[in-house]
């Protein structure tokens, strides 16, 4: 029933309504005329992205400075998805690092983020705990994977059906050489570069599926720490990848 409405009653002020989040994905929106769709989208964007912008800016500047000034650590903000327009300026003002994920570009005209365009004050990563890993994402949407293979990696021909260790290493290397000050990758994405040590079952790599309340944080390493410490080829490969990216970072700073 809830998916058949465009507006939700306000729970504090009777007789007032606000646009329902994600209504554009449902039949009720698709059944509208183009004129009505445009009208709804204007209301939607105004309500969620502009109307409360000053309010959220004031709230942020009231609370965040106390947090950022109470520690010497670098502070990273999770600024993905549906956020007010003021977030970027607040983070820049307070020198909070943004989070950059290539498959979730912040530039609307991009299908994939451009690693060399990431802001220096940012954390670059391939996947988060709420997303599929690199290998899992590769197998989710073949057409999207094909476009990534051709445009982002610059390869010709048909993309492999699975993300091979060689492909994963290339993608990891690209991220390590991004413009971000930090590149922090998940354990699963690090292991993806080695065919011997990565999990044989790619579905077991994912940590959490936010849309599924039954999918809790049940990820477990499929190898022991003792095995990992003895994985000389894997450790050597990672040790070789990181200094190269560090050299790139130092060159950027100078």
How should each PLM-predicted stretch be described?
Residues 1-244:
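Active-site and adjacent substrate-binding regions of carbohydrate-active enzymes
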Residues 247-254:
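Conserved small/polar residues in nucleotide/adenosyl-binding loops
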């Amino acid at each position: 029933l809830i998916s058949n409405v465009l507006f939700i009653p306000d729970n504090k002020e009777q007789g007032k309504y606000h646009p329902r989040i994600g209504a554009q994905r449902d039949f009720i929106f698709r059944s509208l005329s183009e004129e009505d769709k445009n009208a709804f989208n204007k209301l939607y964007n105004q309500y969620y992205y502009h109307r409360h912008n000053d309010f959220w800016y004031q709230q942020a500047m009231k609370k965040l400075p106390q947090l950022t000034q109470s520690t010497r650590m670098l502070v990273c903000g999770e600024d993905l998805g549906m956020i007010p327009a003021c977030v970027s300026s607040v983070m820049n003002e307070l020198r909070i690092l943004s989070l950059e994920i290539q498959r979730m570009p912040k530039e609307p005209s991009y299908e994939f983020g451009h690693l060399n365009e990431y802001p220096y004050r940012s954390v670059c990563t391939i996947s988060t705990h709420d997303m599929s890993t690199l290998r899992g994402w590769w197998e989710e949407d073949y057409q999207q994977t094909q476009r990534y293979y051709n445009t982002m990696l610059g390869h010709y021909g048909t993309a492999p059906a699975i993300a091979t260790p060689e492909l994963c290493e290339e993608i990891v290397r690209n991220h390590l050489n991004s413009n971000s000050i930090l590149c922090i990758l998940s354990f699963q994405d690090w292991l993806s570069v080695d065919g011997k040590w990565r999990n044989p079952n790619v579905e077991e790599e994912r940590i959490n599926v936010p849309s599924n309340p039954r999918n809790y944080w049940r990820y477990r390493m499929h190898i022991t720490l003792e095995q990992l410490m003895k994985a000389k080829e894997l450790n050597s490969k990672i040790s070789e990848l990181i200094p190269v990216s560090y050299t790139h970072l130092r060159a950027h700073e100078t």
